[in-house]
Amino acid sequence: MDLLRLSRLFSGPHPIGLSVLQRLDLLRSTQWTGGREGPAWLRAASCSSSSHQKRMSSLCSDSSTPVAPQEEEEEESFGTLSEKFSSRRIFHKSTAQLYNLKLKEQGVEEEELEPRLRQGGRNTPYWYFLQCKRLLKEGKLAEALDLFERQMLKEERLQPLECNYTVLIGGCGRVGYLKKAFRLFNDMKKRDLEPSDATYTALFNVCAESPWKDSALQSALKLRQQLQAQNFQLNLKTYHALLKVAAKCADLRVCLEVFKEIIQKGHAVTEETFCFLLMGCIQDKKTGFRQAMQVWRQMLSLGIKPSRHGYNLLLGAARDCGLGDPEVASRLLLTSQEETILLQPPTGRRLAGGKVQAKTRHGVSVKHVEALERQLFLEPSHKLEGPPAFPEARETSRTQPEVETKAEPGHMGALAPLALKPPDLELQVNLLSLGALSPAVVSFGTVATPADRLALMGGLEGFLGKMAEHRLQPDIKTLTLLAEVVEPGSPAESSLLSILDRHRVEADITFFNTLIRKKSKLGDLEGAKALLPILAKKGIVPNLRTFCNLAIGCHRPRDGMQLLADMKKSQVTPNTHIYSTLINAALKKLDYTYLISILKDMRRNSVPVNEVVIRQLEFAAQYPPTFDRYKEKNTYLEKIDGFRAYYKQWLKVMPAEEPPHPWQEFRDKPVRNQVITENAGGLRDG
């Protein structure tokens, strides 16, 4: 009877026993999680239910009763899990090591993106702007970029402002980091931030300071085209940055194109504008000095007061550039002012600081700038062209006779170098002024050296006198440039130290390095060494450039070896430039014994070799083109053979110098040992 009742419980369309067992299984699964066991009565009930289930399964297998619906559903669902894998064609192997590696990488990424806990509230974008500005003033561009990109964007996930990008682009501009600056600019546009005038000024400035001039010029011209397509109006400061790009990366013609655009837009022409034109003149090494004098005289004709920076640019032109064709220079610089001055001051009111209002500028127009351009690039066969639209100037030129190019034999003189002119003529020649020159000066003579070009500007005293007329005092850069252009070994060079004290200018190591280099080039090594006690008296410490300038005059082996020994005593390690200078001094004397001694010392100090040194040594290892080894014995050729044998072995053991990338120091991420805190308003060790 009991078996019949049990069979009825587990048979039929809706067996009651199976539902009870399912409820018990559900209760067991919910309460026995985590390896915990239930009470004893529940375990006994489960055991009894399992035994009953086994009995019924055996009874069902013996009898011909149909299969339960739940078992039918389980049979139907068997094998359906493989459907989502059956469509795959490629299977990746997965091991425990790969899984652990994946977890480690995820942990590193989460650690990088996890914001650091800071004291105080959350920082603002303007606070980050101030911190980046402070770091850039300290010359820490890499730290400023890391602070912006890692801490502000990744860790705190703040939305940057336009000023955050502009200050970093400006920092990149100071060092010429062109690639990073345009990356920041593109990221700025992706965030829908509107660039300001300061942003475009910083972008043009980074193009001007880039070490790769061609690519920088292309980037600047492309940016200029984009701004023109957007009809974006540039201010004068941005135009000056564009003018700086043209002066440093292009030539004077491109500068004049920008200059004409500045006038077309109605901007005021300032002294800074002409300074950038002077920088463009310096790019022409052949005729840059003559062009610089023309631009200078046009600036003075507008009544614009020059600055100390403008005088320094003139000295740079005298040092690096030539006068060009003497006939053209005589026609442009020695003729009457009415024929050569094309930019006239306006009749309206003049602003303070030398600026001219655009609305009242009657003398400066695009037509006159084009005439100035034709004069700047005048060829010997071309005819001198006067101002195109100055009726007042034309009437004056009709009433006054032109300056004669021919004079009486007793009054004719050529503007020759300073040492060849009479003493009274030296004081009358100064092209820096707009006044007429002496009638005795009708043409230029040989102007080949920087000292000759300085003589055209009145010499040392005349140049400083012109600065005094404009109430300008020379700085250390002015005196350093004067030291480079004065006649070597002249009294003017000796008077530079007294001028230094007279104007109370604090000397630096660059000024004394210039004097030491000039004396060493003359072969006056003792005179160069005599300047070292003056350095010590003024508290100036010599640097590697000082020893390199001394090495120029070490033509004898004992002088060169003594210099290396003195550097060792001073605990200064010679670099590649010093050894290259000594090698050059030995090559001028064809002293192979001296050359081998230099290479031995270079090997002892393990100084890496650069391309310049290799070219020097390859030239030293060459045989004379017309020598015959078997004709007769030649001691000179034997020395070359000895040097070639040592040079071959020397190359095998010497390290090579890899030139550093200009932007490498900014690409390296700084060590993350400092955290910005709001409490101190700066950096704090974290």
Swiss-Prot record:
Q: Which Gene3D superfamilies is this protein grouped with?
A: Tetratricopeptide repeat domain (1.25.40.10)
Q: GO biological process: any one?
A: tRNA 3'-end processing
The record ties this protein, via InterPro entries, to: Pentatricopeptide_rpt, TPR-like_helical_dom_sf
Report keywords, A-Z. Answer: Mitochondrion, Repeat, tRNA processing
Gene Ontology CC annotations of this record: mitochondrial matrix
Q: Where is this region: Disordered?
A: 55-79, 383-407
- Residue ranges under compositional bias (Polar residues)? 55-67
What segments bear the compositional bias annotation Basic and acidic residues?
392-407
Q: Where are the PPR repeats?
A: 124-160, 161-195, 196-234, 235-269, 270-306, 508-542, 575-609
Q: Name one GO molecular function term.
A: tRNA binding
Q: Where is the signal peptide?
A: none
Give the UniProt subcellular location, in the record's own words. Answer: Mitochondrion matrix
Q: How does it assemble?
A: Associates with mitochondrial leucine tRNAs. Interacts with ELAC2.
> What's this protein's family per the entry?
Belongs to the PTCD1 family.
Checking PANTHER family in the record gives: 2-OXOGLUTARATE AND IRON-DEPENDENT OXYGENASE DOMAIN-CONTAINING PROTEIN 2, PENTATRICOPEPTIDE REPEAT-CONTAINING PROTEIN 1, MITOCHONDRIAL
> What's this chain's function?
Mitochondrial protein implicated in negative regulation of leucine tRNA levels, as well as negative regulation of mitochondria-encoded proteins and COX activity. Also affects the 3'-processing of mitochondrial tRNAs.
This one is known as Pentatricopeptide repeat-containing protein 1, mitochondrial
